[in-house]
Amino acid sequence: MSGWKLGLDGFVTHFMVSGPQEEPYFNEAKDKNQLRYEAYLRSVIAEHKPVGETGEILVGAKSRLNEEWKYYYDSGSCFVNISTFYSVMRHIHFDIATVLETSSDIDVTAALWSYAAVDVYCNGRLEGALKQPVYKPIQKKELTLHLKAGRNLIYLACENLGVRDTRSVAGLQILNHKDEIKVSIPDEACADAAAVAEAFLESA
């Protein structure tokens, strides 16, 4: 079985990312308390639309968000982080994809970490979700991934409210069966090139 080992504490560290897709956001609610107002908007913004058919997840190909897929590399970081500052409100969507490889069918306990609302799919099946975004602290939710022998597509559909300093961050931590899992990405050709580039960078 090829692929990368899990990172520190069982975190997945290799991903493909599409987005962010940013759309203007308006809500008629009003509140003089800015933090309370933002908390309310976060409680209602997430739509959790079913992902459906993802299409080919290849570098440069368009995702369901009509944004290109990119390989995400951050030198072993535990999280995908595409945070930025917003001067006007935006509804943010971004998708994350990775592959977990195993030699046998296993049920894996995982922890999803994010400030965003996230739906987690394993081979097209919804396995769990964070229902709404938060400003802080980061959210954590344990869920079960039903892995089949071979390559398993893990797909995170993320939504966030873009307002001021917005934390668009997500991570996936494997809590058991760590020695039985290798990590890859959906674009196998890119995975080979990424492995070579990563080895070069880490040897410098």
Regions found by a protein language model. Name each.
Residues 1-78, 157-204:
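Accessory carbohydrate-binding/adhesion or oligomerization-edge regions at the termini
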Residues 11, 15-17, 99-101, 144-146:
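Generic structural detector for well-ordered beta-strands
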Residues 80-84, 95-97, 138-142:
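Short structured motifs
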Residues 88-100:
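Short beta-strands within extracellular/lumenal beta-sheet-rich domains
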Residues 92-94, 104-106, 114, 137-139:
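Residues that act as N-cap/strand-start positions at coil-to-secondary-structure junctions
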Residues 101, 107-109, 142-146, 171-174, ...:
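Ser/Thr- (and often Asn-) enriched beta-sheet segments in non-cytosolic proteins
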Residues 102, 107-121, 154:
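Aromatic-lined ligand-binding clefts that engage carbohydrates, nucleic acids, or primary amines
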Residues 119-171:
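Beta-strand-rich ligand-recognition modules
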